[in-house]
Amino acid sequence: MPESRAIVIFTDLDGTLLDHDTYSWEDARPALDRVNLLSIPLIAVSSKTLAELEHINQNAELFDGLIAENGGIVSLKSAMEQHGPSSETIDMVREQIRSAIHVPLRSFRTVEPEIIAAETGLSLDDAIRAGQRHCSDPLIWQPSAQDVRIARTIAEQKGLNLVKGGRFHTICGPSNKGHAMKRMLERLAVFYRDMSGKPVKRFTTIALGDSPNDIPMLAEADFAVQIPTKNRGRKAPLLEHSNLRLAPYPGPAGWNVALNEILDEITNTNKNSEVLHG
């Protein structure tokens, strides 16, 4: 009897599926079309807010599930779960950090949308959505290494984390992209069971990311893809992984090549398995 399994793809956005400067995914279009044709679930995993991800998906219809605020929010089929800390806790820790460091500190939760737009290159409407945060807060600062250490220590003393993404350090809860990936797989397993009437024995997972905050997600995946940082070329691996691939190009161009290669490999290796795409 062939093994019943399902392929699921988890991807970071900024600097990975989306170009770091233009936020375009057009260079990934061939692989995206293939994923859509095969009905493979594609899950966005981002430090962006749920409002941002929902807006992107309303326009592009790329994603089957959304993981927002660095793993603090998991959304599938319009059902949302929050696993991150309260906004009050985030605000308290941020103010403690502000008092302890040696540089000015602002954040997405404390500035006007116009400043978020200037810092990110987003439109004003997109900047408004970027500020609608429930359980995380990207910092706007120019820290020294010592400032980062101080901020991380304060966050950890309160049970929170300070994580480095493609653009910002972000205060967030202990739930990371890897934890959220596991929660999403649990929910997908229920969805497949309800849809097909039989359980999925296992998932084959592919994860793509470019930043330190992607490490927990990459570590959980069967196939992990590290996207090089734009204008910096290839860099040392973010983690040790038995199946880590380094994409040949930054952003969506590298995403496209790496994902197509993995899908080719899975297809050629598992012709005798029953593959559930969606």
Please name every model-derived segment.
Residues 52-55, 115, 150, 216-217:
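Phosphate- and divalent-cation-binding pockets in alpha/beta enzyme and binding domains
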Residues 9-11, 66-67, 207:
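Residue-level marker for buried hydrophobic side chains located in beta-strands
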Residues 21-110, 229-230:
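Active-site phosphate-binding/coordination module
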Residues 41, 161, 223-224:
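Residue-level detector of anion-binding/catalytic polar loops
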Residues 100, 104-206, 212:
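Conserved acidic, metal-coordinating active-site core of Asp-based
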Residues 5-22, 218:
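Asp-based phosphoryl-transfer active-site loop
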